[in-house]
Curated annotation (Swiss-Prot):
Alphabetic keyword roster: Repeat, Secreted, Signal
Localization per record: Secreted
Name the UniProt record assigns to this protein: Cysteine-rich repeat secretory protein 18
Domain of life: Eukaryota
Name of the encoding gene: CRRSP18
């Protein structure tokens, strides 16, 4: 038998446990839907060398990054989620490119670009003429060359899940099928941009029910690529990194030109743009 005091303590603890459990579920839900903006990876590219302190290159670079903090400047790029701008002439030309995830356009895009830009310039790759950084919601690249419209085969990385698939619970063919279907949607889905011009969205997300489990995925290509370029980029990176992820429960493969992700849990809001349930 419980004493009256112990019973009262038990009843007091029940709502506390419920509240704590609810809060933990909410935190987990926010994290799983990728609403955070975590740093993922960066690369300092040595090919183009370094710029000198006080040079025209450094001044142009600083001016560009600082302008991103102004809500009235480059608002078009933040609203569309993509911008590529070149300033100056070689050898002091500076090319800045950023791409935001389509469901992170607007203020989220600007916040990510500002954070990533300063992180790359000041902490990760100071004085490098070419560097790239990836966050959850965006990538930022600066370079002394204009490479728009070209597939970048050099700057990439693979982030596999720490957990392996058990048996044949979700086959390689099923994962490839989802990624291929999402790529088809990304290159064939036409929508109007903020100027009313019809263009391929080059992005798709979705989920597929497989028995008792669901497989979630997302693909995105850089907005400067053509439909053919997007297809080629996705095919290359799916094959190139297959050994990295073929036995894993999830993976992120990111490059300068395209990226994809799949997981056994939801990481994209199903109410977001261009989401499909297969």
């Amino acid at each position: 038998m419980y004493s009256s005091s112990s019973v009262s303590k038990r009843f007091v603890l029940v709502p506390i446990v419920v509240v704590v459990t609810t809060q933990l579920l909410l935190v987990r839900n926010v994290s799983s839907l990728n609403l955070t903006n975590s740093y993922l990876h960066h690369k300092c590219v040595v090919n183009q060398g370094k710029y000198k302190p006080g040079s025209k290159y450094e001044k142009s670079l600083d001016d560009i990054i600082q302008s991103f903090s102004n809500k009235d400047k480059d608002s078009y790029g933040f609203r569309t989620g993509y911008s590529m701008k070149a300033y100056g002439k070689e050898p002091d030309m500076v090319s800045i490119t950023y791409q935001c995830r389509i469901d992170s356009r607007g203020p989220k895009c600007q916040s990510c670009v500002v954070t990533a830009g300063y992180e790359l310039l000041r902490k990760r790759c100071p004085r490098y003429k070419e560097a790239i950084i990836w966050y959850d919601q965006c990538l930022v690249e600066f370079s002394s060359l204009d490479t728009s419209g070209q597939i970048n085969y050099d700057d990439n990385f693979c982030m596999p899940s720490a957990k392996n698939l058990i048996g044949n619970s979700i086959s390689l063919e099923e994962r490839l099928h989802l990624l291929n279907n999402l790529t088809k949607i990304a290159v064939t889905k036409i929508d109007k941009n903020i100027e009313g011009i019809k263009k391929p969205v080059l992005y798709a997300a979705g989920e597929k029910r497989l028995g008792t489990k669901s497989l979630y995925g997302m693909v995105q290509c850089s907005a400067d690529l053509s439909v053919q370029g997007c297809n080629e980029c996705m095919l290359y990176y799916i094959v190139h990194f297959q050994e990295c992820w073929e036995n894993k429960q999830g993976v992120r493969v990111l490059s300068r030109s395209c990226n994809f992700r799949y997981e056994l849990y939801p990481f994209i809001n199903p109410k977001g743009p261009y989401y499909t349930k297969f």
